């Protein structure tokens, strides 16, 4: 019992911790029996003046109780992370800025005095563990005389036994005092004010002496002050300093804003080096702050030419400042957006080679990036490749996403991540393969599909490939195929991919990217001049546009703000040029980053108002039946955005009427359509007369659009991955008498009615009584395609069958849910094929 008594005390759940802690000493007796010794320690522990042995242990929360949870957490870790040493990244330390409820960071030193003499008849002033939660608080208030006497008695004993003392110091909560004054301040203003309110005499934070026991005197007081100073300097990682960053850096302008905070471009006052500073609000992300601090310590160990350097971190009361290397070339995704061109194969090989070097280094130090994409592959002004936006930003994004909406898109996710299996650094290899397709084609695979459906498609579909088989070399095709191996065990590592011929034969250096970077810089400068000539706001308003839009270090943003009154404000050319007719959410197709910076260089208010009026007129004219201003051959399409090139696609008049009427069934499609309609109504039917100089797309994009249009015009369909064969019930195709008395005649009335309901109703699962109020006649072209295609007729008939089952059969909850999903899949399939 003598050796187990400290452990038994640690295993018990500690009481809720008070705001102020004082000294506590635990005495153990080795001569008593186990049961009687435990009872006596609870009632009246012994004390002796001649103590010859001290045992020190660190008390941190409920260590034994949390051990089982830690084991469970370890079992859930990926294999790569399970190999990490226990102290990798730094352990949890005392955090003076955390809430009282967070117990992970509060620990001190507990001195255990072991007594080997016989039992003393003296009553000890110390009780068992519950006194930890009562006595210190009463002593701090000074409201309990008995407690004060007991403490004085303990101090006398301490003087005899020798100098020792134990304590846990927790600073007072200071967060509630400054809320009202900072409401109207900007993020930077609040952060600077927060820094200036802190004490920046050095790297140590001055502790409030009132937080310790007011009864300590003499040598004990000096010991406690020394220990206070020691704990305050070691409570924060060495990488986080308490200096005010505004005294070391000159903040130039804001580069962007995300869910975690803001990114600023700054200049080092001593070296004149340009850096990027992320300002993170701690009050919004405290639940993950311990992980963030540990991640910062590990990031300081990263030292590789292909990884963005983290130059340091600064902590105020409410803000964390992370200083990192500034990449003036922007991200690869922004480079393609600005120049409106995909990359050449030799440029892709160079970027993949450098990115693999950075990934191999990160994996060698047991670090997984988890967010490789074109927006996080950064370029310096000289063309060097850097991997950015990992570690702190990724951890913060995951923390913030717990209380915010879904951040980012899953197009780059590996199958094992989506299936929530264990994964390692090979997920970065998969993401690099998707990024290679993104660099070659301008957009990642399945870019026009809703993110939630992409999760489903990545899991069940074959791995994506390069679309143009003839344009790219065989080694490039093989490189992409190796990266996109669905089975993680068969997928090569980053170090193995460095030996692939595609990157091994690449002899180009950073100069390969110089032409693109220079062209991008010129385009941005032109955009900035155009913005200043159209609008005349302050320089601060225009400083975030143009050249700075892509400098937020790894966050993909729409690079080209609207320049003319006739332009849709959220259109990004490259992000829209490959979107095909199966787009479900037209407004979300191309913004893949975790942050969007909206430009403000719009035209004057009068032009905006007139444009809005034109858009309303054009949209109303379309949905009345036949468009007024459009000849049949020039109806704009949802994925055609070239307003300068004369239309190369001829649509039948019947199809144009069909398109305009179908647009009423989709709000997103209608928004796109009337934006383009306003443009052509102003300039007549000749689209080449418009002034949209910055919305042209390349010939390669139009070649793909022509190819897709020819598929649709020929009546063919692309494979529909989300429709299963089991959805098509045989009874729906073979039975003449369907349930509910629905009779099917030779003309396919049931199928036509089902398609009519699909065309009219935006809710595929709405009840019959609600349909029919806003019915519109089925367009002749759709009716003709339905009656001449047995496949479409079967699909429509199956839809009618499942709707009848859902509406008229008594189904259990699970069966009803399955029917709803089947109906939704069939509706999506028909809408995709018929382009509703």
Swiss-Prot record:
Q: Which InterPro entries match?
A: Kinase-like_dom_sf, Prot_kinase_dom, Protein_kinase_ATP_BS, STE20/SPS1-PAK
Quote one Gene Ontology molecular function term.
protein serine/threonine kinase activity
Bias-annotated ranges (Polar residues): 224-238, 562-571
- Which keywords label this protein? ATP-binding, Cell membrane, Developmental protein, Endosome, Golgi apparatus, Kinase, Membrane, Nucleotide-binding, Nucleus, Phosphoprotein, Plant defense, Serine/threonine-protein kinase, Transferase
Spans of biased composition, class Basic and acidic residues?
28-40, 606-618
Q: What is its EC number?
A: 2.7.11.1
- Which residue intervals define the domain Protein kinase in the entry? 249-503
Q: What happens when the gene is disrupted?
A: Dwarf plants with reduced cell numbers, endoreduplication and cell expansion leading to a slow growth. Altered pathogen-associated molecular pattern (PAMP)-triggered immunity (PTI) signaling characterized by a compromised ability to elicit a reactive oxygen species (ROS) burst in response to microbial features (e.g. flg22). Enhanced resistance to the bacterial pathogen Pseudomonas syringae pv. tomato DC3000 (Pst) due to high levels of salicylic acid (SA) and subsequent constitutive expression of pathogenesis-related genes (e.g. PR1) and associated with reduced jasmonic acid (JA) levels.
Residues where ATP binds: 255-263, 278
Q: Which residue stretches, if any, does this entry annotate as coiled coil?
A: none
Q: Where is this region: Disordered?
A: 1-244, 539-571, 600-640, 760-780
Quaternary structure (record)? Interacts with MOB1A and MOB1B via its N-terminal region at the plasma membrane and in the nucleus. Binds to BIK1 to phosphorylate and stabilize it. Interacts with and phosphorylates RBOHD upon flagellin perception to activate it.
Q: What name does this protein carry?
A: Serine/threonine-protein kinase 1
Q: Which organism encodes this protein?
A: Arabidopsis thaliana
